[in-house]
């Protein structure tokens, strides 16, 4: 079986497949992706493959500069987005935004 290139929490799977989640915000350990990369996507919980995405762009962001557009692209409110990022990456402030489209 081919390994996955990136994983998402299972709770985001349906939003990704439906095109409601079109970015992911990651820390420096996943800052190497670039536009044009085609990635196998798995669930964090069991590493089960569920789709393929194409990276359409990348940028940097801080916790303080997250905005409503980021929240919309994540399919959540801005307050919820900031809370989720702070829970996943405690004590970090610099992040990498990966824009993507689901290829299925």
Swiss-Prot record:
SMART domains: ASCH. Residues 6-94 form the ASCH domain. It catalyses: N(4)-acetylcytidine + H2O = cytidine + acetate + H(+); N(4)-acetyl-2'-deoxycytidine + H2O = 2'-deoxycytidine + acetate + H(+); N(4)-acetylcytosine + H2O = cytosine + acetate + H(+). Its EC number is 3.5.1.135. One of its GO terms (molecular function) is N4-acetylcytidine amidohydrolase activity. It is an enzyme of class 3 (hydrolase). GO terms for cellular component: cytosol. SUPFAM superfamilies: PUA domain-like (SSF88697). It comes from the Bacteria. Gene3D superfamilies: Hypothetical protein. The active site is at residues 21, 24, 74. Pfam families: ASCH. Catalyzes the hydrolysis of N(4)-acetylcytidine (ac4C). Belongs to the N(4)-acetylcytidine amidohydrolase family. This is N(4)-acetylcytidine amidohydrolase. The lineage of its organism: Bacteria, Pseudomonadati, Pseudomonadota, Gammaproteobacteria, Enterobacterales.
């Amino acid at each position: 079986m081919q390994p996955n290139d990136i994983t998402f929490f299972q709770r985001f799977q349906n939003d990704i497949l439906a095109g409601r989640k079109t970015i992911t915000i990651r820390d420096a350990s996943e800052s190497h992706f670039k536009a044009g990369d085609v990635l196998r996507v798995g669930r964090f919980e069991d590493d089960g493959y569920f789709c393929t995405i194409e990276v359409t762009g990348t940028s940097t962001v801080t916790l303080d500069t997250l905005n409503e557009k980021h929240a919309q692209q994540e399919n959540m409110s801005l307050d919820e987005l900031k809370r989720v990022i702070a829970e996943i990456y405690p004590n970090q402030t610099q992040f990498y935004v990966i824009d993507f489209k689901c290829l299925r």
